[in-house]
């Protein structure tokens, strides 16, 4: 099945939809027939351009809603704008997140609070708002939260980030269970190392990586490459569509590692302190 018409007549909200994985998901949903899509992001120029191209190339009505997800007021405006424009929400994808580095020793209270505001609180209230519309309109909707393989424990330099993704995983399961009688499905993807503009930026900013860092990174992976947004978008579309049936409450690992398996012990790169 090529998925054509899979989302015909449906309206989706995709956070982080102005670049990387979020943009790939939004484009795929439109390609597969979505009649409306709302994308969010912080860069207004980029967001307006993505929305315009979704409308011109995909034929859907597309809106960009600028949103700083650390600001709860801006978070709550996202679904409200979608409801105002379309009168419904069928699909929600929480793809936006921050991945700022920090160990148990150097993570500041400010970074910790921002991490949980963007990565946990924002998805929570976006789900709350979307579910309220789904219930009002009697929609058997679907929600996908983008998590991380780091939610299994994570790296020493991603302590708060890993905790935030673990928290969102627990919320995913709780909300999926809570909405069983309403036939609203909630699932998540634990994605691994992915080739996105955001990853390129943080590799240079946080790790002083050279311009060609991805060449060596991909050479060292089992499949000879990092994950690509388009393939993860297809997995998200599966979870959002009728193809996944009654699947709900699942946290799916999407990576080229197998959690809990390895031929050498995992050790931090260096002692802290």
Positions of PLM-derived features:
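Short C-terminal tail/terminal secondary-structure segment
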Residues: 2-4, 248-273
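Substrate-binding pocket helix/loop in short-chain dehydrogenase/reductase
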Residues: 103-104, 111-116, 217
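Conserved glycine-rich cofactor-binding loop
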Residues: 11, 18-19, 43
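Residue(s) in the substrate-gating loop at a strand-loop-helix junction
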Residues: 148
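Short, small/polar-rich loop/turn modules that mediate ligand/substrate recognition or access, typified
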Residues: 93, 180, 185, 247-249
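Alpha-helical segment proximal to the catalytic Tyr-Lys
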Residues: 132, 177-181, 245
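Active-site helix of classical SDR
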Residues: 127, 164, 172
């Amino acid at each position: 099945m090529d998925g054509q018409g899979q989302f015909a007549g449906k309206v989706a909200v995709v956070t982080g939809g102005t670049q990387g994985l979020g943009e790939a998901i939004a484009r795929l949903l439109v390609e597969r027939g979505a009649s409306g899509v709302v994308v969010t992001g912080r860069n207004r120029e980029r967001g307006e351009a993505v929305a315009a191209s979704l409308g011109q190339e995909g034929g859907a009505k597309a809106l960009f809603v600028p949103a700083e997800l650390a600001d709860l007021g801006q978070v709550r405006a996202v679904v409200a704008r979608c409801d105002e424009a379309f009168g419904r929400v069928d699909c929600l994808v929480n793809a936006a997140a921050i991945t700022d580095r920090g160990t148990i020793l150097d993570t500041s209270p400010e970074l910790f609070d921002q991490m949980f505001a963007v990565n946990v609180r924002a998805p929570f209230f976006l789900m709350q708002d979307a579910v309220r519309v789904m219930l009002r309109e009697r929609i058997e909707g679907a929600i996908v939260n983008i998590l991380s393989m780091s939610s299994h424990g994570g790296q020493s330099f991603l302590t708060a980030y890993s905790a935030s993704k673990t928290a969102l995983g627990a919320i995913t399961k709780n909300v999926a269970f809570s909405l069983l009688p309403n036939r609203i499905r909630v699932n998540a993807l634990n994605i691994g190392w992915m080739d996105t503009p955001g990853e390129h930026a943080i590799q240079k900013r946080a790790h002083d990586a050279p311009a060609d860092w991805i060449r060596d990174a991909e050479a060292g992976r089992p499949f000879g490459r990092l994950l690509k947004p388009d393939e993860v978008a297809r997995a998200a579309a599966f979870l959002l569509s009728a193809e996944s049936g009654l699947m709900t409450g699942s946290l799916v690992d999407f990576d080229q590692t197998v959690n809990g398996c390895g031929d050498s012990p995992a050790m931090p790169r260096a002692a802290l302190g």
